[in-house]
Amino acid sequence: MEWKIERASVEGQRLAADIRLQAIVDGEAALPGSLRDAATVLGVQARAVPGAGETQGDKVVLSGQVLFDVLYAQGDLTRVQCIETACDFRQIADAPGVTPRMALAWDVCVEDAQARASGGRLMLTAALSLYAIVTADAAIEAVTDVTGDPALRTRCCRARLQRTTGRGEARALVREEFELPAALGVQDTLYATADARVDEVVGGEGRVTVSGTVELTVCHAGGESRPLVITRHSAPFEQSVALEAGEEDAVGASVRVLDVMADSMEAGEDARVLRTEVELLVRAQATHAAQRELLCDVYTTSGDLAEPARREERLMADGAGERARESGKIVLALPDDAPPVGTMLAAFVQPAAGTRERSGGRLRVDGMMGVTLVYLPIDSQVPVSTRQDAPMSVQFACGLSADAAIALECVEAVASAITSDRVEVRFILSLEGMDCGAQPLQVVTDVTRTPAQAEPGAIVVYYPAQDETAWDIAKRYRVDAQSLRALNPQLEEARAGEPVVVLRRGAAEA
């Protein structure tokens, strides 16, 4: 009998590379004060801004900037000053099989930042964690079924395939003003940081509207009793993005803070106004998910042998980005040589992710947390700082797997003195991650017929190996699965070491 092989073109996205990198960025900046005045670094915050990403022949090139905000005191040690500077980075990662114009998604975060003053200059260092996922559109000719002979036995499986059908991005500028009460004692605004999140994505017909919230943390210079003042503010944003999406496509969006500017000025008697400007990059993406019925395996119970030809493909199944937040707290004991706490001014937290484990619908992230405390000692108007590393373990409510690429940031940290040598730090961490969602799929590309050698009939007692299934046993001895279960009524699924009785073709039933 002639076999009829049914084929179909399967459209999906192939995972070309999943890259994880660590990098160190060094830089320096000149202090504006006199060389004769020693400078004391009180704290440093750094954030990484992704720039251009490019796929080339067997490699991926990632570039961007690290923005440093350094608090220091120089000359008048009771006065907190700030210097802002940027350092460029460029990383090249080997990626065999990658070609130009493949789709690239990547992100970067700062895991540690340090600053040291020497000879009128600041020496800056940042440790970066980068990840990149490269995909390519793939159209695969796959066998979906084989018919035409009653001796054929086929097993099909459902494959979930996901592919990106559209991308779009736009820049947004969020300007907002806030009142600063006179009770805060703000004299000047030093710098600001911002975190943005997406709250809603709506729209259609070629455009989507992305709305969300920008949260700002602003550092100000104050008076002698409180030389450093921290204020927090929030503002909404809304941005339209051009995006072509189908009716059955899922639409998602993400937002990245590119730049933050803040300044304050007097506005009448005992009043001050804070003016902020935040530049955002808003990205939208449409994805289409589909279930396809594909041939997984085939054999015959008589006649010619059926030999499936297979090819392994890593196709995207559930790849998606996700964002989550979680709060926590730690209690720190000051170092023995640190002066006792009088007035707590600020806390800066820099998380670094280590091991990850998924349990109970949550992703637990263990790692280290660099904590910088800025405070006024008892009976002193000169601010000091201490930096300590503390272990952390935070559980995020999200659907990311333990192998997902993640980036951690601290969006808020508040410190309060329990005693003169113990401080409680409450923090909120933001996790942004991406599951590549690739599944190794054995695609049957063809089925060939080969003559079968004559074999005598027999009754066989077979002991399955580990991970061997009833289908594997039936295929090995070219018997029907129903006859296998008829001889083994208790057989739900094969178990290693438990005997299975097989009536081989040609044996007569007693």
Name what the model sees in each region.
Residues 2-456:
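Membrane-lipid interaction segments
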Residues 449-486, 491-510:
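Primarily a LysM-type cell-wall glycan-binding module
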